[in-house]
């Protein structure tokens, strides 16, 4: 069982649900390691965006409020930081602020940047899992540390009915591991 293969299988599983849509930078075109996990996803399920992380997270919330399930892809935590306002003040709070009236389902995919074979410098290898866990009450953050963790975590994120959204954290250094 390979890390990359399990990610690809998980994306294909998510894509099989008619409500899912994949959104982010380099989802419809090559550009990141995550792009390679989407190569077999139908183009009509991929929404390519410019570099505008806060807008992307806001769009994800809007899609979720319209009964879609966005799979919002931020290749690294360091990019996701630019969407923290939407994540912490809106997505995490919308169910509470609406007295349970709105409970969107949003799947957020991010990663800890790879350090090998080339270290991209420290602004690309952050892991903000613990900080986000402390700031959010209705978002579960799951680190995908082993290949066998991947499919069950993505399946849980799609099937959950506990009004929680999910951030799944991948490890860039594991993409090429056997």
Language-model segments: what does each one mean?
Residues 1-178:
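Thiamine diphosphate
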């Amino acid at each position: 069982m390979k890390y990359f293969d399990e990610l690809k299988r998980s994306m294909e599983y998510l894509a099989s649900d008619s409500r899912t849509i994949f959104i982010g930078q380099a989802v419809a075109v090559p550009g990141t390691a995550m792009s390679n996990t989407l190569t077999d996803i139908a183009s009509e399920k991929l929404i390519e965006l410019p570099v505008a992380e806060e807008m992307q997270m806001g769009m994800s919330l809007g899609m979720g409020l319209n009964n879609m399930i966005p799979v919002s892809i931020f290749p690294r935590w360091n990019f996701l930081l630019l969407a923290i306002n939407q994540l912490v003040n809106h997505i995490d709070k919308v169910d509470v602020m609406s007295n349970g009236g709105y409970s969107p389902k949003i799947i957020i995919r991010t990663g800890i940047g790879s350090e090998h074979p080339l270290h991209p410098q420290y602004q690309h290898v952050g892991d903000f899992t613990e900080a986000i866990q402390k700031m959010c009450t209705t978002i579960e953050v799951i680190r995908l540390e082993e290949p066998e963790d991947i499919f069950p975590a993505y399946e849980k994120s799609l099937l959950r009915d506990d009004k929680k959204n999910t951030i799944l954290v991948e490890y860039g250094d594991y993409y090429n591991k056997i």
